[in-house]
């Protein structure tokens, strides 16, 4: 699979966020190297695993689970007879603590068999060994006195001997006869032995062994004769202490080494669980759900939200391809959400293929694609010093080489960057060829020719991103079945362009363009009016007439989802007529209106 889509669709940003939610460094690397599920069955299995962990995360909260370093090498070293350091044993204890924490978390609530059972059953906690290591080793440099009876006894003797030495040295320091020979009234350590600082010129006045000289030569560090024997005793005790520490480390290392096969199996399971936990945490952040995976080349995203847009600002969209139509041509104003719709469709399908739940309604269905073929933006043309048009054509040439059954092709501003007539003709030809090759298609455009092509071609449907001409702001709502307008005249008039210029511009339009613009204006007007009343209305084929649907008698309510069906002639584009729907004033009931075009058995608009 071509992986360029990961950057273009911003899947890399989703993965980077998931990396931040991983606890272990190894899991972070696994997430960065994540590959899409190779088959539909694999995708379904991955999604059910993520969904199971997500449900437990919501129900039980986060497990007791901390970051650990890679320890399989440490265990293998112990298996071969190596002695582990205190720091390495603490890493082992932390890993064992993770095993215990995950096992306890999984068992907090009763549940039926889950697809993650094998992972959690693979965990083999060692609570006794974990506790012994944790209580015996205080830090990578310090072992607790209580690590063994022998160690406790040796350290007690060391402390007693040290106290005896300090008492004798304090007497020397306080003695008026000897303290005048000292540089400072302090006791220090040199070569593991307690000494006092003597002025160099009085070195013969304080009997004992010289162990060091200061850098200036003004001070010599003398071990007084009175403490030589006690210092030697301490050296002996410290050697015994180190031997006991080594014995304890050897014992722990042997126990760890004996666990190697089971430990490695548990460790691998822990990393996979950490990966799933990161995916589940991301799902909680995004309010995501598990979609179904279609057996056919078809997807249906309901109330889909782009995961990288602020949840307070993102507008959910409904996008479907592969059932009644295989190609969606999206039109509308710039910055109106056309490109976001493309990216949302591609990104959410791709996320599911990587085992992520998607920010869409749980009734959504995704498709398992072999390729995501994307031409969005001008990154490549900028890098290679190509014109915008040349950059697009270079990418589309590569797309044509790969497009086929079970591929999703997303084309932004198809045919842009060249002569409009040639660009539109080329865009239609590209769409037709990609359809012949069997790819599902979504394309954005400003060309009226593509809107007409979508109206006239079975399997191709218009969609538009709505624009509020009063506020001059896009609503970001995607309306499938209705082509969009550029709104150039309305926007220009709102911004102060004289009306005579607008009128002159209209006269320069061809008759066909005028008719299409009129149809689009009426459809858009109906749509905006209907949205305000929570009802959808479109044209009837009654020549020159107005269809009026009267509400039930006063005091009655409209049954929920009452459906009114209109059938319009195939020549709708040449004769758009108004419709009036009388909405009951006593409630907020919804009326569903279905519009059938020509002899089509399914509604074109609903």
What kind of region is each of these model predictions?
Residues 153-203:
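Extended, Lys/Arg-enriched charged tracts that mediate electrostatic binding to polyanionic substrates
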Residues 286-287, 294-526:
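ATPase nucleotide-binding head domains, primarily ABC-like/P-loop NTPase cores
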Residues 125-139, 229-250:
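Extended, charged coiled-coil "arm/hinge" scaffolds of SMC/Rad50-like chromosome-maintenance ATPases
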């Amino acid at each position: 699979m071509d992986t360029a889509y990961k950057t273009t669709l911003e899947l890399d940003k989703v993965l980077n966020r998931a990396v931040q939610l991983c606890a272990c460094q190894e899991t972070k690397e696994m997430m960065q190297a994540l590959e899409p599920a190779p088959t539909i069955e694999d995708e379904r299995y991955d999604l059910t695993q993520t969904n199971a962990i997500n449900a437990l995360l919501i129900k039980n909260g986060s497990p007791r689970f901390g970051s650990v370093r890679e320890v399989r090498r440490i265990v293998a070293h112990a298996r071969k007879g190596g002695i582990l350091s205190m720091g390495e044993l603490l890493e082992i204890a932390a890993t064992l603590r993770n095993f215990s924490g995950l096992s306890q978390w999984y068992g907090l609530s009763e549940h039926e068999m889950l697809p993650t059972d094998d992972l959690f059953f693979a965990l083999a906690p060692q609570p006794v060994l974990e506790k012994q290591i944790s209580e015996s080793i205080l830090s990578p440099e310090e072992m607790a006195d209580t690590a063994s009876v022998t160690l406790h006894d040796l350290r007690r003797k060391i402390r007693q001997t040290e106290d005896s030495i300090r008492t004798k040295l304090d007497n020397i320091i306080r003695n008026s006869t000897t303290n005048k020979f000292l540089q400072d009234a302090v006791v220090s350590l040199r070569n593991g032995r307690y000494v006092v600082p003597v002025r160099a010129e009085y070195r013969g006045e304080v009997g004992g062994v010289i162990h060091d000289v200061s850098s200036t030569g003004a001070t010599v560090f003398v071990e007084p004769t009175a403490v030589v024997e006690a210092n030697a005793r301490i050296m002996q005790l410290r050697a015994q202490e180190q031997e006991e520490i080594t014995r304890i480390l050897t014992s722990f290392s042997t126990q760890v080494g004996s666990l190697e096969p089971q430990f490695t199996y548990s460790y691998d399971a822990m990393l996979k669980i950490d990966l799933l936990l990161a995916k589940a945490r991301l799902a909680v952040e995004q309010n995501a759900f598990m979609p179904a995976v279609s057996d056919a080349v078809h997807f249906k995203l309901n109330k889909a939200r782009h995961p990288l847009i602020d949840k307070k600002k993102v507008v959910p969209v409904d996008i479907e391809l592969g059932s009644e139509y295989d190609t969606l041509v999206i039109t509308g104003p710039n910055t109106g959400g056309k490109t976001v719709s493309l990216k949302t469709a591609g990104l959410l399908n791709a996320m599911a293929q990587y085992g992520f739940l998607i920010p869409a309604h749980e009734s959504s269905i995704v498709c398992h694609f072999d390729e995501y073929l994307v031409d969005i933006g001008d990154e490549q043309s900028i890098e290679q010093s190509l014109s915008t048009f040349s950059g697009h054509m270079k990418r589309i040439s590569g797309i044509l080489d790969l497009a086929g059954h079970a591929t999703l092709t997303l084309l932004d501003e198809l045919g842009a960057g060249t002569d409009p007539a040639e660009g539109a003709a080329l865009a239609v030809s590209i769409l037709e060829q990609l359809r012949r090759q069997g790819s599902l298609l979504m394309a954005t455009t400003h060309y009226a020719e593509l809107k007409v092509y979508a109206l006239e071609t079975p399997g191709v449907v218009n969609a538009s991103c709505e624009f509020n001409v009063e506020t001059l702001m896009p609503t970001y709502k995607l309306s499938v079945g209705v082509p969009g307008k550029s709104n150039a005249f309305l926007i220009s008039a709102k911004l102060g362009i004289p009306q005579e210029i607008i009128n002159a511009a209209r006269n320069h339009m061809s008759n066909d363009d005028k008719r299409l613009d009129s149809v689009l204006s009426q459809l858009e007007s109906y749509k905006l009016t209907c949205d305000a009343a929570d009802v959808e209305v479109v044209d009837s084929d009654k020549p020159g007439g107005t269809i009026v649907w009267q509400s039930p008698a006063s005091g009655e309510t409209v049954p929920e989802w009452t459906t009114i069906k209109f059938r319009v002639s195939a020549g709708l584009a040449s004769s758009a007529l108004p419709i009036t729907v009388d909405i009951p004033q006593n409630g907020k009931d919804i009326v569903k209106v279905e519009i059938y075009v020509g002899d089509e058995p399914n509604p074109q608009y609903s």
